[in-house]
Amino acid sequence: MPGGTWIDHFPGNFMWSNATLVCKGMAPYGAVAIGEIDRICERLAARGMGDPDAWWQEWCSMAERNEALADEAAVDGREFTASDHYLRAGNYYYTGERFVPPGEKKLAIYIDRKSVV
């Protein structure tokens, strides 16, 4: 963990800590992986807390990684593995766009997220 406890992942940044905790709450259902969340948070802490672009970029990066693993598994006929990775990718995209304010950028994320990254 970057510098806080399991609950207060980003000391002094309640929004990021709370959003991370909400995401971690999905772990018992296989919707996220704690190790992946920890890696995201380590990268965020290294970039400096509070930058909403960093938040989106780091969560999106992990989502894209899972999406690529899902695509690969699907091609190989490993449907359960693919579905696990697609589920995690979706939750990471969802978590990443959490702090993008309403407007053109958020709309672009929904239309074509790759144009925003």
What do these predicted regions represent?
Residues 67, 71-74, 81:
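Hydrophobic/aromatic side-chain positions at a characteristic register within alpha-helices
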Residues 116-117:
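Conserved small/polar residues in nucleotide/adenosyl-binding loops
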Residues 79, 83-110:
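Short, charge-rich amphipathic alpha-helical segments embedded
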Residues 1-55:
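Long, non-catalytic architectural segments outside compact domain cores
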Residues 50-57, 76, 80:
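Short, solvent-exposed segments of well-ordered alpha helices
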Residues 59-63:
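Short amphipathic alpha-helical heptad-repeat segments
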Residues 38-45, 64, 88, 92:
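Amphipathic, alpha-helical segments enriched in basic
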